[in-house]
From Swiss-Prot:
Protein name: Protein LAZY 2
Gene behind this protein: LAZY2
Upper classification of the organism: Eukaryota, Viridiplantae, Streptophyta, Embryophyta, Tracheophyta
Residue span of motif IGT motif: 42-48
Region described as Disordered: spans on this chain: 1-36, 51-89, 260-280
Comp. bias (Basic and acidic residues): 59-74
Alphabetized InterPro entries for the sequence: LAZY
Length: 295
């Protein structure tokens, strides 16, 4: 707010100076007219009066010069007095206040631009009134029309150019994205086609066909066949040995069991024989009281 007050004081001081200087000069110029207005024109035509009028005019011109110099001195003194006060006021501001003042000035400038645009619109609206009221000044009306139209056309052209640039940039970016996507899709398709064609070649190509792998030599085939035969023989032997080992174990078990049973039977028979031999001849009593020798 201090800054705005200082600006207003400066502006008001300049206007007052200009008005006072103009008023003083106008007043000085009007004084001789008022003095000579009462005198008759015949007296001025005489030579004696003409000489006196010249001397009076010279004195008045000197007085005017003196007054102008005095006013210049006064203005210089007032400017010298205002300059330190303005510097003091500027020193009192902080950087935050300066930033706020800059923002306010930007707002004022934007408002002035808006006002100018509003004025141009009003001029465009009030064109028939201007033509009607200022009929002799048709050239000025035409100039105003041309200026307003040029301003409007320039602003519209600038906006159109900006819009066109934006749309062009958007279109170019989209085209780049589409081209990149199409390239990636083509690469994927080529890879899939190559893989499928390679598989078909592998499946359907004959031994003497266009196969990329080299054909095996006779030595390799012979060596492979010999090794395969040996491996097969080894496997067969192992399998037969395992199969034969299983029934032998069973037969041995059965044989041993049979041996045990036979041994048990033989032992039982021997024991029975021994018992019979140990008993010898026995007397057996019967109901008929006959003695029978049982062997």
């Amino acid at each position: 707010m201090k800054f705005f007050g200082w600006m207003q004081n400066k502006l008001n001081g300049d206007h007052n100076r200009t008005s006072t200087s103009s008023a003083s000069s106008h007043h000085v110029k009007q004084e001789p007219r008022e003095e000579f207005s009462d005198w008759p024109h015949a007296l001025l035509a005489i030579g004696t009066f003409g000489t006196t009028s010249n001397s009076v005019s010279e004195n008045e011109s000197k007085n005017v010069h003196e007054e102008i110099e005095a006013e210049k001195k006064c203005t210089a003194q007032s400017e010298q007095e205002e300059e330190p006060s303005s510097s003091v006021n500027l020193e009192d501001f902080t950087p935050e206040e300066v930033g706020k003042l800059q923002k306010e000035l930007m707002k004022l400038l934007s408002r002035t631009k808006k006002r100018k645009s509003d004025v141009n619109r009003e001029l465009m609206k009030n064109l028939p009134l201007d033509r009607f009221l200022n009929c002799p000044s048709s050239l000025e009306v035409d100039r105003r029309i041309s200026n307003a139209l040029s301003a409007v056309v320039d602003s519209s052209e600038e906006n159109k150019e900006e819009d066109m640039e934006r749309t062009i940039n958007v279109i170019l970016g989209r085209c780049k994205e589409i081209s990149i996507e199409s390239k990636n899709n083509k690469k994927k398709r080529d890879i899939s086609k190559n893989s499928v064609s390679y598989l078909f070649k592998k499946i359907f190509v004959c031994a003497d066909g266009i196969s990329t792998a080299p054909s095996p030599s006779l030595r390799d085939t012979l060596q492979e066949s010999r090794m395969e035969k040996l491996l097969k023989m080894m496997l067969h032997k192992k399998i037969n040995a395992q199969a034969s080992s299983k029934p032998t174990s069973l037969t041995t078990k059965r044989y041993l069991q049979d041996k045990k049973q036979l041994s048990l039977k033989s032992e039982e028979e021997e024991t029975s024989e021994r018992r019979s031999s140990s008993d010898g001849y026995k007397w057996v009593k019967t109901d008929s009281d006959f003695i029978v020798l049982e062997i």
